[in-house]
């Protein structure tokens, strides 16, 4: 279920006495977490599903002509399908996932996006609620791990397999371990709460931003997030590594929700409540 091809071919009895296939490994092959479902396929499906449905919703609100809307509908879904195909093929090609795992990722990502997009409470929830949810989910996951550990169930079994079968030790990255993924997600949730309750966000929300300014926010945010993504930490001290991963993920949500829009609204005058600043 959670096996990855690059170690599974060495341990399976499927091939009997015959030789196992020789799978080429890459610097991003040796991920250390369980492989099902594919996180990359799931993330891509979730993001693209939200973008496509949002654009189609805007087109309906603008009363787009039926023929143009139909072309837009087909084109956007085909584009999403093409992106997903590229993501899935790349994950299978680099021996990080089996085909059924990327398919499971697409289905899971789409379902999560559909459910979460209908939940509006995330915009009105208090900062205290964000903090308590983050604390509860983290504590529950850690407590569940400790309980299973006491029952001799090792949830980190994939780490040993990755270290054993990866052809180069430096390719085994701690940031793909289950706990690192958990803290990244919790950091993102907490960062979203901080961003939505920041005084900078409240100030920017009251202002009417033009289309060029919004495009500028997107471009600058993506650029800064790309730079932030390249910021890596030493895995020598696990506690420090996990704490910095949590903080990095929180900052990643603050950049597009609060920091960049606020900075641009200060640099370029925008309208607020019918007045020019």
Swiss-Prot record:
It is found in: Endoplasmic reticulum membrane. It is a multi-pass membrane protein. Coiled coil: none annotated. A motif (Prevents secretion from ER) lies at residues 274-277. It comes from the Eukaryota. Its main location: endoplasmic reticulum. One of its GO terms (molecular function) is glucose-6-phosphatase activity. Keywords: Endoplasmic reticulum, Gluconeogenesis, Hydrolase, Membrane, Transmembrane, Transmembrane helix. Its EC number is 3.1.3.9. InterPro entries: P_Acid_Pase_2/haloperoxi_sf, P_Acid_Pase_2/haloperoxidase. The keyword Signal does not apply. It is an enzyme of class 3 (hydrolase). Pathway: Carbohydrate biosynthesis; gluconeogenesis. It catalyses: D-glucose 6-phosphate + H2O = D-glucose + phosphate. One of its GO terms (cellular component) is endoplasmic reticulum membrane. Pfam families: PAP2. One of its GO terms (biological process) is glucose 6-phosphate metabolic process. The keyword Hydrolase applies. Hydrolyzes glucose-6-phosphate to glucose in the endoplasmic reticulum. Forms with the glucose-6-phosphate transporter (SLC37A4/G6PT) the complex responsible for glucose production in the terminal step of glycogenolysis and gluconeogenesis. Hence, it is the key enzyme in homeostatic regulation of blood glucose levels. Belongs to the glucose-6-phosphatase family. This is Glucose-6-phosphatase catalytic subunit 1.
């Amino acid at each position: 279920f959670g096996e990855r091809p690059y170690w599974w071919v060495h341990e399976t009895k499927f091939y009997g006495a015959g030789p196992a296939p020789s799978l080429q490994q890459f610097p991003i092959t040796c991920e250390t977490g369980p492989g099902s479902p594919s996180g990359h396929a799931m993330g891509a499906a979730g993001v693209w599903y939200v973008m496509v449905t949002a654009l189609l919703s805007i087109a309906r609100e603008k009363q787009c002509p039926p023929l143009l809307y139909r072309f837009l509908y087909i084109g956007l879904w085909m584009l999403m399908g093409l992106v997903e195909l590229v993501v899935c093929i790349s994950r299978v090609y680099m021996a990080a996932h089996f085909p059924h795992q990327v398919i499971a990722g697409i289905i899971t990502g789409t379902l999560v996006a559909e459910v979460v997009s209908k939940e509006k409470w995330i915009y009105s929830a208090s900062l205290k609620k964000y903090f308590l949810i983050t604390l509860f989910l983290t504590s529950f996951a850690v407590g569940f791990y400790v309980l299973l550990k006491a029952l001799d169930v090792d949830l980190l079994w994939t780490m040993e397999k990755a270290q054993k079968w990866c052809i180069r030790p430096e390719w085994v990255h701690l940031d793909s371990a289950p706990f690192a993924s958990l803290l990244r997600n919790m950091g993102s949730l907490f960062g979203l709460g901080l961003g939505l309750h920041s005084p900078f966000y409240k100030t920017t929300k009251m202002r009417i931003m033009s289309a060029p300014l919004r495009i500028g926010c997107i471009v600058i945010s993506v650029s800064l997030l790309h730079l932030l993504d390249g910021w890596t930490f030493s895995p020598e001290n696990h506690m420090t590594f996990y704490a910095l991963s949590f903080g990095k993920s929180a900052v990643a949500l603050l950049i597009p929700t609060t920091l960049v829009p606020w900075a641009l609204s200060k640099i370029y005058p925008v309208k607020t409540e019918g007045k020019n600043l």
